[in-house]
Amino acid sequence: MSALDAAEAALAALHPRPYPLPLGRLAPVVEGAFQGFGRTGWVVCGPRERVGATLRGCPVERLVLAASGARPYKLAPCSEAPGNRALHAVGLALASREAVLCLLGTASAASGAFYEACNVAGITGAPVIFVVTVLPLDDRAPVGPQLAGAPAALASACGLAAHTVAPGEIAAAVSSARASARPTLIQVNLE
């Protein structure tokens, strides 16, 4: 059992709120993103991805309430609107003048707030790193396609560095993006 699996099991036993959200196929994305980003700098993510903060030394007890941050570990509180996370990350990057990691999914990228965040990051050069996970949709999905194009294409159009990587390449891509100190979107396609 990996450290992330153990942390996820410990968090589930504490009955996190709003409700337990298992990582499932997102585990390598979360692990790679947190490992590549390191222990310093703010992280903005959803309730599901918060367990990655344990890789920074955050105790699982600090992760029970998704709406609460874990300040000593630079984990921002979760926004109820997924797309707003991108705006919060850009704001944190501009205010701190340090790299900020933001974990998003397709629903976040389909939000107008995501476009606004990419636009502001492109204009200002905010050192934000968006990691956007794209899952394939089949007939069992509760919704149809949410994006007309790829998140990496939208980010590139806004002036961000944009890369599409496999799950095993996330840590290196995040580390490289952090070293570049420029706004970057890393798209991860899960098959």
Named regions from a protein language model:
Residues P16-G125, P145-G159:
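Cofactor-binding active-site loop characterized by glycine-rich and histidine/acidic residues
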Residues M1-L23:
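Cofactor-/ligand-binding subdomain signature composed of acidic, glycine-rich
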Residues V128-E191:
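Thiamine diphosphate
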Residues A7-L11, A33-F34, C118, V174-A177:
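A generic alpha-helix structural signal
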Residues S2, P28, E116, G168-A172:
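Generic recognition of stable, solvent-exposed alpha-helical segments in well-folded globular domains
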